[in-house]
Amino acid sequence: MYRRLLFLFVILIGWQLAALSAFREGWRRSVSGGVPADTALIDRNITLGEVVVVGRRKLIELSNDTTLINTSGLQIHRGANLEALIKKIPGMSYDRESKQLSFNGKVLNGVNINGETFMGNDIASALENLPADAVELLKLYNMLSELEKMTGVDDGAEDFVLDIKTKDSYNGSLVGSLAADHGSRGKRLDEAQANVFNAGGENLSLVGRSDNLSSMDVGRGNFQNMLMGNVVKKLGKRLTLTGSISTSTFHNETESRSYDEQYLASGTKYQGSSALTAGRNRSDFANFSLKYKIDDRTLLNISANGSRARTTGSSATTTELYEKGSAIDSLTSSTLQTSTGGRATSYYLSTDFTRRLNKAGTSISLKADANGNSDHSDNLSLSQTRYHRLAGAAGGDSLLLRHLYQLTPSHQRNSRVSLRFTQPLGKLLRLQAGYGLVYRKTANARDSYDYGAPMRPRVDSLAGESRLATRGQELTLRMDYKGRHWTVNGGVVVEWQRRSIGQRQGFRSVDSTLRAVEYKPTATAKWRKGKVSVEMRYDGYTTQPSLSALLTPVDVSNPLSVRMGNPGLKPSYRQRLDVRVEHEKYGLTLSGNYSNTFNDFAEEVSYDNATGARTYHTVNINGNRTVEGSLRWQKQLGAFLLSGDGRAFLRHDVALSNESSQSVAARSETRTVDGSVNLWCSYQPKWGYVGLTADWRLSRSHNRLTDTRVNSIDYGAGISGDVELPWGLEVRTDASCRLRRGTYATAADDQWLWNMTVAWSFLRQRQATLSCTWNDILSRRNDINRSVSAYSYHEIYRPQIRSYVLFSLKYRFNITRKQ
């Protein structure tokens, strides 16, 4: 039945797009004397720095280590934002939930406009608010800091950004929009924005928005309000000021149901939960930076940012623990209600001063930075736990009632001062040495009060304070070689630490001093010749155990999930090796990586067979490793864009579990094999857009402790299209399906989506648009996620807002400055 439905949808949408495009083409021929007016790509001369491309413009080009994306051939609807534009670029992907933007597997850390930072590198704000029509060219590259540019030495940290070159018609003009979207199920959006861009990098932006479209979770009163602004101002040729500010408020209520299977030596244990959570957050953020080129040999950089937030929340959770695959044989049942509140602040200050000592490039740099945060939270919890295997005083099930109020303030402060000396050896090689002083301090506390007893006494056994102070010295050695075909960069940072740890719980206090050494080696080698490039990269770093992992007081607010610290933890060392090969002519990218961790931090789970309660404490463990490989291909054939990618991922996870019947913890190992294939095709003529997608995802896991195997296979397909019609009319539609198959999947997990928009643009320059959108026409939206770890199998389902209609009115303006 579902295959027939899918077939009918594909035929219906394909027929609709074909009919509309035929009508559009016939009308165009009638007004142009029978000569087709559409052409996918425009012949023109393009000047890109020192690179000149003559003839038909390619979508994606490479210039040294910069990827250039020419967007003139991409067709987007009127009033589209930057997010709608990047969806039509092969290899570009954006995850709305995680706010992560990537291109061909490389994660992008920020968005620039004409070479300058926009909105403090807030990717979501840039994608949702920048008008796509203002974009002339997209550039992707590893952005060096001003200090790295001045010294000529890369510090080894990758910082890939998306840099937007705006069209000349937008530069110097005031452009913006006013929008109001309102529809059924209470969905709405009201927005106003204004932008001023300049080719030299100066920009000014102001955005205000109130909406609830970003969340599809079922809940009452969900919304987000935000106001943000950004400014870049250049005072002469030597001084650049950048600032951004934002304030936001949101409320989110979510329902969820989850299911878990925990891997134990005596067999698999099961857990089912349902929860209703609600939270409200108010946050403010400000960012400022100054770049002052005092003279040709002297540079000063200053940057600062700060934030504050206030949160309130509540939750109600019901949990059932049982030993067999049926909730009828219940081991323990519980309800937990919580009410939370908190406030948090953070700050960051950084400055560096560099002076070149001669024309060869010898330089000395002084850098200082400081950052910190504080968090004050309170939690009121009421739990009722019924143990069906334990007898109470009256002979029935044992019942535990716990009503606790907890205050948990925490503070963290970090500072660093370093001096670096850079010496060129010839024109291609530079060496750098640095020495620095480091200071870090962390303090955590918890006060617990028994609200179930008269007078609400303080519970000393659940209260305590802990602190960690680290004083260190660091030595930095780096080299940077830039040749015709080779670029080699590498170095190591060694930090000698003296760690003072203290804890007080009740009348008992403990103080100790430890000495440790941290290593952070990095090495990168790139080779490029013609259309081929090869890159190898190694990263490693030592991580000391956090204060919370070392000395967290026992937390029993949830009797079925108790957490405690482990003062015997050792530092861990993580390393990763990446290899990447690109061939521009054939559009191929081959990449792979391997990573593993020595003395990794993992939680040992102690399981009580009588109650089902779990106690977690952090331990060191070895055996966690991953291997990943991917192959990507893309090709442009006139107005057609084709791309595909395949990915394989192998993961080996290790955990420890201990049951009340065991004297030694059992080692739980889980091997997971993931694979995926994605195919993408689009046709982008002048009259619109047609896109086809298909994907296949495989995941197989095997837990050796219980010999449990979990398999899942997802199939996905989609079609989308935009058609421009006469008289300012436009039709947009998309349909997709997600078929989930495997060990736990059923047909009810499948998702079928079909959305359609009809828009009419009017006024003299079509600057106003009235549209109607029907979202999720089939009312088959689903949100279910499954995952496997060394501890357990986990799945969670969140009910979604389904079919709704949205009416929109948007007005765009472009006010050009008179010459």
Residue ranges of model-derived segments:
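Membrane-proximal, glycine/serine-rich, low-complexity loop/turn segments characteristic
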Residues: 21-50, 56-316, 336-378, 418-440, ...
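Extracytoplasmic loops and strand-loop junctions of Gram-negative outer membrane beta-barrel proteins
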Residues: 121, 175-177, 268-274, 329-337, ...
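Outer membrane beta-barrel strand-and-loop segments of large Gram-negative receptors
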Residues: 416, 458-464, 474, 564, ...
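Sec-dependent N-terminal signal peptides
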Residues: 5-13
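Outer-membrane beta-barrel translocator domains and adjoining extracellular loop/strand segments
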Residues: 151-152, 217-220, 253-269, 313-330, ...
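Conserved C-terminal beta-signal and adjacent last beta-strands/turns
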Residues: 676-698, 706-819
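Signature of Gram-negative outer-membrane beta-barrel scaffolds
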Residues: 404, 430-528, 537-538
